[in-house]
């Protein structure tokens, strides 16, 4: 060892093992996802205590769930038939890093895009169905999301089916610029054609539903349901406060606030949504 060589200051230890009475013991690692912090009550919740519906046992906060989890909770087992899976996302503006971000998100989520579309039965009631997944780039609305939802309405018109959409989105996808914003008008036109055919359109607003999705098809349903405490809005709270220079109510942009002011028809617990949707579909000439 040289005179000026750096010496180790500390003893290296392995936190996953220890020796007691001359016997080497291994300490099991605690999985990173064993507990979840509830955004509602701020408590650490054992994941298994959340149950399939991902509801906090302390405050009943509904955790955000994936499209796959939503399907399992909502539709009849084995009834879902996915549609419009072959549409590929492109990069119309050559936005730097966009395709790489898409590839990484697809690998992480197992989804091709931010919305899953298809046909299913809910308690025996047949419907066209779309579920947005906030795990995919915050379920932002790009050209593929717009195309899939538009095609779903067109399919529903041909098959004379109602449409149920579970919305969740951070808004328009900025990487696609004006092409993303165009989807608002495109889907809205499809909603109108579906309505002209005398068919039911039901939306379920889930946390969060914001931006261009709120400003278009999320609020165009014949019946608008929402999960409790869902964040619903267009611009962000701070943007609005800075613009109007007023302090907004604590419950501003929450589902309960919107129901009180007539923008939401009913707030339904996640565990009761399937029954509620099926009942509404049956009232409006449901298809078996």
From Swiss-Prot:
The organism encoding this protein is Streptococcus thermophilus (strain ATCC BAA-250 / LMG 18311)
Q: Which gene encodes it?
A: accD
Q: Where in the cell is it found?
A: Cytoplasm
> What GO MF terms are annotated?
acetyl-CoA carboxylase activity; ATP binding; carboxyl- or carbamoyltransferase activity; zinc ion binding
Gene Ontology terms: biological process: fatty acid biosynthetic process; malonyl-CoA biosynthetic process
Top-rank taxon: Bacteria
Q: Which Gene3D superfamilies match?
A: 2-enoyl-CoA Hydratase, Chain A, domain 1
> What UniProt keywords apply to this chain's record, in alphabetical order?
ATP-binding, Cytoplasm, Fatty acid biosynthesis, Fatty acid metabolism, Lipid biosynthesis, Lipid metabolism, Metal-binding, Nucleotide-binding, Transferase, Zinc, Zinc-finger
Any keyword Mitochondrion? Answer: no
The uppermost taxa in this organism's lineage are:
Bacteria, Bacillati, Bacillota, Bacilli, Lactobacillales
**Protein name per UniProt:** Acetyl-coenzyme A carboxylase carboxyl transferase subunit beta
Q: Name one GO cellular component term.
A: acetyl-CoA carboxylase complex
Q: What EC number(s) does this enzyme carry?
A: 2.1.3.15
User: Which cofactors?
Assistant: Zn(2+)
**Zn finger limits (C4-type):** 38-59
Return the similarity comment.
Belongs to the AccD/PCCB family.
Q: Per the annotation, how and in what number is the cofactor bound?
A: Binds 1 zinc ion per subunit.
């Amino acid at each position: 060892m040289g005179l000026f060589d750096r010496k180790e200051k500390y003893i290296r230890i392995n936190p996953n093992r220890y020796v007691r009475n001359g016997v080497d013991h291994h300490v099991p690692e605690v999985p990173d996802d064993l507990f979840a912090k509830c955004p509602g009550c701020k408590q650490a919740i054992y994941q298994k205590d959340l149950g399939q519906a991902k509801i906090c046992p302390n405050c009943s906060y509904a955790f955000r769930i994936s499209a796959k989890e939503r399907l399992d909770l909502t539709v009849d087992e084995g009834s879902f038939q996915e549609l419009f899976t072959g549409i590929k996302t492109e990069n119309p503006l050559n936005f730097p890093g966009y395709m790489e971000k898409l590839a990484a998100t697809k690998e992480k989520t197992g989804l091709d895009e931010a919305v899953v579309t298809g046909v299913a039965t809910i308690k025996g009631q047949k419907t066209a169905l779309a579920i947005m997944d906030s795990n995919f780039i915050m379920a932002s609305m790009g050209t593929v999301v717009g195309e899939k939802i538009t095609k779903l309405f067109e399919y529903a018109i041909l098959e004379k089916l109602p449409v149920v959409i579970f919305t969740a989105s951070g808004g328009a996808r900025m990487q696609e610029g004006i092409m993303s914003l165009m989807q608002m008008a495109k889907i809205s036109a499809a909603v109108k054609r579906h309505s002209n055919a005398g068919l039911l359109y039901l939306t379920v607003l889930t946390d969060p539903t914001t931006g261009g999705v709120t400003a278009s098809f999320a609020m165009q349903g014949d019946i608008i349901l929402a999960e409790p405490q869902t964040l619903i809005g267009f611009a962000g709270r701070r943007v609005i406060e800075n613009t109007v220079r007023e302090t907004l109510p604590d419950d501003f942009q929450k589902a309960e606030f919107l129901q009180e002011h007539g923008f939401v028809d009913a707030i339904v617990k996640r565990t009761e949504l399937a029954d509620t949707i099926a009942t509404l579909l049956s009232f409006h000439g449901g298809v078996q």
